[in-house]
Regions:
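Canonical RING-type zinc finger of E3 ubiquitin-protein ligases
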Residues: 32-41
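Cys/His-rich, Zn2+-coordinating zinc-finger modules
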Residues: 3-13, 19-25, 30, 46-91
Length: 91
């Protein structure tokens, strides 16, 4: 079966929420480091990725069930839907 190219969670995003700062909002509180950052498209939180020791964005998803994130990395233009395990590139 082919993987869908979009889902209702991604279709519901009318305007991207971009990161306000290039820091993990949780790691910065404890002085921890991160590898890459992601921005939640529901609430705008910018948190660290799964390659980072604390995996704050996945923890955020488990707690809030906010479905879609974007990469906050300069030059990267993709989003990810947690419920559908779906990556989508955008322009």
């Amino acid at each position: 079966m082919d993987q869908p190219t979009n889902c209702e969670h991604i279709d519901n995003i009318k305007e991207l929420t971009l990161p306000k700062d290039y820091v993990c909002e949780e790691c910065i509180k404890t002085g921890d480091e991160w590898v890459h950052l992601r921005t939640c498209q529901t609430c705008g939180a910018t948190l660290c990725c799964d390659a980072s020791p604390n995996m704050h964005m996945t923890k955020h998803n488990h707690k809030t069930h906010h479905p879609v994130i974007i990469s906050a990395e300069p030059g990267e233009q993709w989003m990810y839907c947690y419920p559908h395990d779906l990556f989508i590139d955008y322009e």
